[in-house]
Amino acid sequence: MTTTETGTRDPDALVRRAGKRADTRQDQHFLVDDRVLDRIPEYATDADIDLSHVLEIGAGPGALTDRLLATAERVTAVERDPDFAAHLREEFTEEVAADRLTIVEGDALEVDLPDFTASISNLPYGASSEIAFRLLPEQRPLLLMFQQEFAERMAADPATDDYGRLSVTAGHYADVEVVETVPPEAFDPQPRVTSALVRTMPRTPDYTVPSDDFFMDFLKAVFTQRRKTMRNAVRNTAHISGLGDPDAVVEAADEGLMSARAGKLTPADFATLATLAYEVGQPEA
């Protein structure tokens, strides 16, 4: 078995042993840069993240899996490609037998997830948003690879160009930080864009909302008209937010909030408006 200077499996050799190339049509881009792979677990240990049971989504040929096994007590790897799932079982036979590695073959958006303590994953770009927002409500630390543009929008502050629905939604569940940008050369095959590693740490918001589901629907609605004032955004998007009486919300809300645009409001501002909308806007049951 070919190993690196640190004693871990060589990523390129893992790809060769898997006997299958990445399918870019399925957004598969294998992380093969040893230096990046070695740093990823360090971002978890530096933050004192509990690594007793790590969930990895999109394990592919197993380069990150190998690094995680060197750090974590247990790893559950979710892989939807049956060929790569079979390769992982063969490559890590000893770890599977020792109950340190569990391979779950299936779609991460559909399978039952274990009771993990953290998720560390190089996500397929096409499903990264859906996977992230399946994981964030679990209130566990996450280290996830995204396209850089998506990552920067996740971590954006209010009133910045990148700030939007994604920023508010992610920040509702966690403190979000871009810890490293990763060039295309770190992957095989190389993607056309730069990637970024995001670390999220669960947080309790400093505001309350009537329900997470209603809050998310309200955000989705008003950010479809982010260039309009909130007055117009609330009125024009009742078909999305489910409000039966959006005019009642506009009349009851603070004028300063109603005259602002979505990109200028803080998460707490949105929570205030969502709570008011829930109370007076006659939302659908």
Curated annotation (Swiss-Prot):
It comes from the Archaea. Keywords: Cytoplasm, Methyltransferase, RNA-binding, rRNA processing, S-adenosyl-L-methionine, Transferase. One of its GO terms (molecular function) is RNA binding. The keyword Zinc-finger does not apply. GO terms for cellular component: cytoplasm. Its EC number is 2.1.1.-. S-adenosyl-L-methionine binds at residues 29, 31, 58, 79, 107, 122. It is found in: Cytoplasm. PROSITE patterns: RRNA_A_DIMETH, SAM_RNA_A_N6_MT. Gene3D superfamilies: Ribosomal RNA adenine dimethylase-like, domain 2, Vaccinia Virus protein VP39. Its main location: cytoplasm. It is an enzyme of class 2 (transferase). InterPro entries: KsgA/Erm, rRNA_Ade_diMease-like_C, rRNA_Ade_Mease_Trfase_CS, rRNA_Ade_methylase_Trfase_N, rRNA_adenine_dimethylase, SAM-dependent_MTases_sf. Specifically dimethylates two adjacent adenosines in the loop of a conserved hairpin near the 3'-end of 16S rRNA in the 30S particle. May play a critical role in biogenesis of 30S subunits. Belongs to the class I-like SAM-binding methyltransferase superfamily. rRNA adenine N(6)-methyltransferase family. RsmA subfamily. HAMAP family: 16SrRNA_methyltr_A (MF_00607). This is Probable ribosomal RNA small subunit methyltransferase A. It comes from Haloarcula marismortui (strain ATCC 43049 / DSM 3752 / JCM 8966 / VKM B-1809). The gene is rsmA.
